[in-house]
Amino acid sequence: MPSFDSKAFLKSVTHQPGVYRMYNAEADVIYVGKAKDLKKRLSSYFRSNVPSEKTKALVSHIHQVDVTVTHSETEALILEHNYIKQYLPKYNVLLRDDKSYPYIFISQHKHPRISIHRGVKRKKGEYFGPYPDSGAVRESLHLIQKLFPIRQCEDSVYANRHRPCLMHQIGRCLAPCVKGIVSDEEYKEQTDFIRLFLQGKDRQVIQTLVKQMESASQSLNFEKAAIIRDQIQAMRRVQEQQYVSDDSGDDLDVLGFAIENGLACVHLLMIRQGKILGSRSFFPKIPANTDKEEVFLSFLTQYYLNHTQGRTIPNRVVTSFEFNSEDLERALTELSGRKVIFQLNPKGIKGRYLKLADTNALTALTSKSNHKLTMYQRFKQLEEALVLSSIQRMECFDISHTMGEKTVASCVVFNQEGPVKSEYRRYNIAGITGGDDYAAMAQVLERRYSKQLDIDKIPDIIFIDGGKGQLNRAYEVISKHWEDWPKQPLLLGIAKGVTRKHGLETLVKISGEEFSMPSDSPALHLIQHIRDESHNHAIGGHRAQRAKVRKTSTLQNIDGVGPKRRQALLQYLGGLQELKSASVEEIAKVPGISHSLAEKIHDALKHG
């Protein structure tokens, strides 16, 4: 037990607001906290009758405490959040959410493009959002394309088109890329409608469209009036689906909360301008014996202060969980420059959505708990099958290529909660003979394990997707590096077996011994899971590599088609897919392409 002189330490602590960091004997930050009164708060940790088991465990590991005095409680709240994000302390509740939130982006262009955007806002244009997940953005874009047919294609495609694409033919794009189809004024009007729609001003758009429809009818332009009528009806259907609040400017987050058996879930229902944008479940990492209020308040603080993820602070946060919200309300009001309030158990439609959020939180928590239990049972079954005392971490490797080209290796990581996707890695393999899987495996393992590993990153099992040959090559590489490791991982090959059927895999040990497991074995299901994850991760990387060269590789094999002609073909016809569907006569219209060469290109693309 570390010798920390709390009495001597507390003598030097001020009564001002601030943040404190607690360190263990290894100089790791194990807890970060804030206080209105540092002396009063820190003194509470070292009383003889501390009721919390979590606090007792924390205090038993304290070796040093650093204090930072701040000017205000808001400053302390922000500094606490930054320290938690920096150090990821063991005894703090941690929000594991490093993904930036997506936006809908309208580019600054003569004919603007609408698209999904993540990350830093470097491009010139307008950003609408954020949305809770990419699925919600894609759904919104799909909806917008039905209502307002402006382009979603890349600028490079737009600049090189000479005829309308399929999206125009099915009424999803006005085809501004081709002269004479739509005027700049008409296109701008549809873009303006999208801006108003995304700002929640649906009624203004409908009023404008109704006037246009009446004007078209009076001018006897019934075809145009019918098109506008359909657009109005589509917008009204959308209004019925998304409508939540009588206040069209109502921005609020509805938070459902559930906690049980050391797991917690916060379900966020995001409503902006009175419309539901989508929802998302969060599962904070909780130290043992943490009380509910600390879990919920830690989530709120980390979620709303994390500006780097592009989140917006709503005017109102609705929840059924009662907690002391004064400090956070004050901080969020100060940060956003407007009044932010937390509303507890409202009535009416907000109350119904709160009930829905609470139900979703409990459902997601139950599902997560069942998954965790299943994963835990599978790990225990695998420990028994392989006669191992404990399995905390596993890694699996696979190789993917097509006829030896664009070889990609993958490494996936599992712990007792399942896949650790943040630690998945892909490796582009180079400098080997095409198709030499042994050399590819040797290269990825050398790159993976030749560097210094943290103790907790050393796997208990390393799976190799392959038989004896691959496993022996893996052993040659890894065994050179594990002499300095505190433990030696078990190496296992996963061979597909004679019939190559799922469930009939053969497992291979480094000794050459082969064995199998029953097809209904939970241990085998875990092995199949990590093998399939590795396989899919490798294939995904390989396909991405192939896609980079796909546009030109098909044309590279045609005699008489050099770089300039390839570029002319793709630019004139608008891309490889359009070129493949073009007739000989259409190809022959491309500058520099004779009729005989057009026939050769057409034949190569159709039958090559």
From Swiss-Prot:
Its main location: cytoplasm. SMART domains: GIYc (SM00465), HhH1 (SM00278). It is found in: Cytoplasm. GO terms for biological process: nucleotide-excision repair; SOS response. One of its GO terms (molecular function) is DNA binding. Keywords: Cytoplasm, DNA damage, DNA excision, DNA repair, Excision nuclease, SOS response. GO terms for cellular component: cytoplasm; excinuclease repair complex. The UvrABC repair system catalyzes the recognition and processing of DNA lesions. UvrC both incises the 5' and 3' sides of the lesion. The N-terminal half is responsible for the 3' incision and the C-terminal half is responsible for the 5' incision. Residues 203-238 form the UVR domain. NCBIfam families: PRK00558.1-5, uvrC. This is UvrABC system protein C. Transmembrane segments: none annotated. The keyword Cytoplasm applies. Residues 15-93 form the GIY-YIG domain.
